[in-house]
Amino acid sequence: MPLTLIQRDDCHLCDPAWEQLAAAGVADFESLWIDGDAALEARYGVRIPVLRREEDGAELDWPFSGEAVRQFLAG
């Protein structure tokens, strides 16, 4: 299942998000950096990090736990 972690440079919450993805067994995901993209910054600026399921566009906003990620992936 294709996943994207939406993040920005110098995001102090992104490292813990990576840890929760690892705890959920998620090893493969793309990163989308919002820096410098006005539309993405407007949409995600205060929400990051956000995990997006590419197949249906569903999004899981931070904070999330490993268990929340597993439930999100289960659909």
What annotation goes with each model-predicted range?
Residues 27-38, 45:
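Thiol-based oxidoreductase modules, predominantly thioredoxin-like and allied folds used
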Residues 55-75:
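Non-catalytic, surface beta->alpha helical segment in thiol-disulfide oxidoreductase systems
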